[in-house]
């Protein structure tokens, strides 16, 4: 396999759609991976499929996980309400170890594909404070990936790429628009209904709306 391949985590939201477009612009053959992990906002899976089709990825996988069997998050446990006001500390929408689990499965697929690059749309500027979105986490996972895999041990190192890490939400929107991302296809809301309409109140909705406003770009989000 000689082409330039990348595995990209695609949630169906604004950030991950932007990352797919950026990777494609860099000449990568894009293989996207989404997760049906018991999240309450399952409309994002439909959004991920739409984005994958629109951006012409080579293959799109949806992996089933039962993270709601663990619970501990407002996104996987319906007995915990999604907060609709900003709070302090790490919010209850944090899903324990989610990005570690997702990246581990992406790493496995990348090794099978002989891809050396894995992209993730984490951000540490306009974000909710999740610990697994920080640069330190990304760097640590890359070190682990190259210790834990046959490819890494044999010197065919993996790179975990987080191109949005230091961008504001407005800069992310502008980058996506420059690459032709159709943000009307995406779903960011933690409480999106089955049609992908947003609540307009959760932290993810606030960050998204503020990003479009600051970027001077019309927000295509539909609300219920």
UniProtKB/Swiss-Prot annotation:
Zn(2+) binds at residues 189, 199, 202, 205. It comes from the Bacteria. CDD domains: QueC-like (cd01995). Its cofactor is Zn(2+). One of its GO terms (molecular function) is ligase activity, forming carbon-nitrogen bonds. The keyword Transmembrane does not apply. Its EC number is 6.3.4.20. Binds 1 zinc ion per subunit. Keywords: ATP-binding, Ligase, Metal-binding, Nucleotide-binding, Queuosine biosynthesis, Zinc. GO terms for biological process: queuosine biosynthetic process. Pathway: Purine metabolism; 7-cyano-7-deazaguanine biosynthesis. InterPro entries: QueC (IPR018317), Rossmann-like_a/b/a_fold (IPR014729). It catalyses: 7-carboxy-7-deazaguanine + NH4(+) + ATP = 7-cyano-7-deazaguanine + ADP + phosphate + H2O + H(+). Belongs to the QueC family. HAMAP family: QueC (MF_01633). This is 7-cyano-7-deazaguanine synthase.
């Amino acid at each position: 396999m000689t082409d330039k391949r990348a595995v990209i985590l695609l949630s169906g939201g604004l950030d991950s759609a932007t990352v797919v477009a950026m990777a494609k612009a860099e000449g990568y053959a894009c293989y996207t991976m989404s997760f049906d992990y018991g999240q309450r906002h399952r409309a994002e899976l439909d959004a991920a499929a739409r984005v994958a089709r629109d951006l012409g990825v080579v293959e799109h996988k949806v992996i089933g996980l039962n993270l709601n069997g663990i619970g501990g998050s407002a996104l996987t446990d319906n007995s915990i309400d999604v907060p609709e006001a900003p709070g302090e500390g790490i919010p209850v929408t944090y899903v324990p170890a989610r990005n570690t689990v997702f990246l581990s499965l992406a790493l496995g697929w990348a090794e099978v594909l002989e891809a050396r690059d894995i992209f993730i749309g984490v951000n540490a500027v306009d974000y909710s404070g999740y610990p697994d979105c920080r640069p330190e986490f990304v760097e640590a996972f890359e070190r682990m990936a190259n210790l834990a895999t046959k490819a890494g041990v044999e010197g065919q190192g993996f790179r975990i790429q987080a191109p949005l890490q230091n961008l504001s939400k407005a800069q992310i929107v502008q980058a996506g628009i420059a690459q032709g991302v159709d943000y009307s296809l995406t779903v960011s809301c933690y409480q999106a209904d089955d049609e992908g309409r947003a609540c307009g109140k959760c932290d993810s909705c606030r960050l998204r709306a503020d990003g479009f406003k600051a970027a001077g770009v019309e927000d295509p989000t539909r609300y219920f």
